[in-house]
C-alpha cells in the first residue's frame, strides 16, 4: 500500500514509485514510463525558464482554515512541492518540516518569507484570500512591499501525481518569469 506521507525520504520520489506501481498494476507500465518522461522533460523546461532565478528562495502557500478564521498553509522542506522547487534550481523559502508536508500558520508568519511567495488557491478560497490580502498587516509584509508575491492558477493541485506536478512546475516558472 502506498504511503502519501513517507516518514523519511522524498515525497516526490514516493510519488514516482507509487505511480510506477499503479501503472504496473493496471497493465500500463509503458504508458506510465512515458508520463514520467513527460514529467522529467517538463521539469527541465521549467528549470531552464527559471535559470535567471537560480538559487533564489521561493515559499509556496495555500489557504487553510475557514473564512471566519483564516490561516495559511506553508509547504515545508519535506513536501513534494518544496522538492519540485529545489528540482527547478530554486531554494526553499520556508524552513522546517511538518508531518504532512505543510505547516498551518497565521498571517504574521509570512513576515519570515525571504525571497518569493507563490500563493496557490482554488476559486472557492477567493473570498478568504481577498480578506487576507486587503489587510494592512498583509500590505506591510516585506515580501508584499517588494512585489514578490505571485499567484498560480486555481486549478493548480499540489498533492497529486505527475500531471499535476507538471502543471505546478509550468505555472511556477511562468509566474516567476514575468
Describe each region flagged by the PLM.
Residues 1-2, 58-62, 93, 118-121, ...:
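Structural recognition of the beta-strand scaffold that forms the well-ordered cores
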Residues 1-67, 155-178:
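Extracytoplasmic substrate-binding proteins
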Residues 4, 98, 123:
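Residue-level "edge-of-site" marker
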Residues 10, 14, 113-178:
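Structured C-terminal subdomain patch of bacterial secreted/periplasmic proteins
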Residues 71-103, 155:
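Alpha-helical, coiled-coil/dimerization segments enriched in small aliphatic residues
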Residues 104-114:
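Short helices/loops that flank or line small-molecule/ion binding pockets
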Amino acid at each position: 500500500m502506498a504511503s502519501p506521507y513517507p516518514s523519511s525520504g522524498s515525497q516526490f520520489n514516493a510519488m514516482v514509485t507509487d505511480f510506477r506501481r499503479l501503472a504496473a498494476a493496471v497493465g500500463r507500465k509503458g504508458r506510465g514510463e512515458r508520463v514520467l518522461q513527460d514529467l522529467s522533460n517538463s521539469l527541465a523546461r521549467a528549470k531552464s525558464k527559471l535559470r535567471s532565478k537560480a538559487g533564489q528562495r521561493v515559499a509556496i502557500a495555500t489557504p487553510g482554515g475557514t473564512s471566519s478564521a483564516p490561516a495559511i498553509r506553508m509547504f515545508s522542506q519535506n513536501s513534494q512541492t518544496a522538492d519540485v522547487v529545489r528540482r527547478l534550481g530554486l531554494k526553499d523559502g520556508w524552513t522546517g518540516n511538518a508531518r504532512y508536508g505543510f505547516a498551518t500558520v497565521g498571517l504574521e508568519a509570512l513576515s519570515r518569507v525571504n525571497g518569493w511567495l507563490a500563493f496557490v488557491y482554488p476559486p472557492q478560497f477567493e473570498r478568504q484570500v481577498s480578506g487576507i490580502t486587503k489587510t494592512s498587516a498583509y500590505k506591510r509584509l516585506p515580501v508584499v512591499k517588494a512585489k514578490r508575491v505571485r499567484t498560480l492558477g486555481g486549478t493548480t493541485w499540489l498533492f497529486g501525481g505527475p500531471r499535476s506536478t507538471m502543471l505546478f512546475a509550468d505555472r511556477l516558472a511562468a509566474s516567476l518569469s514575468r
